[in-house]
Amino acid sequence: MQTRGIRNNNPLNIRYSKDRWKGARTEQTDPAFVQFETMAYGYRAAWKTLESYWKHFHRHRQPFNATTIISRWAPPTENDTQAYIRTVLRLSGLGGRENLPQPSRGVDIAKLERLITAMTTVECGIPYKDVDTQAIRDGYDLAFPGKRSLARTQPPAELLDPETMEELLMWDEYRD
């Protein structure tokens, strides 16, 4: 059975809001999460959300890094935020306080691709190596047309070990 994020083509489980997302299905049947026509449109929404986070953090002179992003994306009122952060850092190889680039600038986007890939693993329970990185790239191109395409990024070899992946995928609260 597919997870909710996969069924909805919304791999980072973006909730309904005032935003009218490009690529949203005409008929929305999920009571909480936006449903998109394609996975690329779901990732487009993720990229646009990250861009809005960058602007918010920049305006408030806060760092834009995996820790601040996930703390806002998956607040402790709804999630085990610290476990989410630890898993994303371990999967992506990013440092928790490592500054990340503004998404729309098209510079060093591979770091953000790794972040989104790891967040997809947490949100959907898909092994990191099986996440559709082409859909992430297509979503980037939909979000920021004309910017540099993403370079393919392979996870560190130790993250592909089946025992490590099994340990990391014990996320029942994030799976349907």
Residues of each region from the PLM?
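Cell-wall polysaccharide-cleaving catalytic domain and substrate-binding groove, primarily
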Residues: 1-176
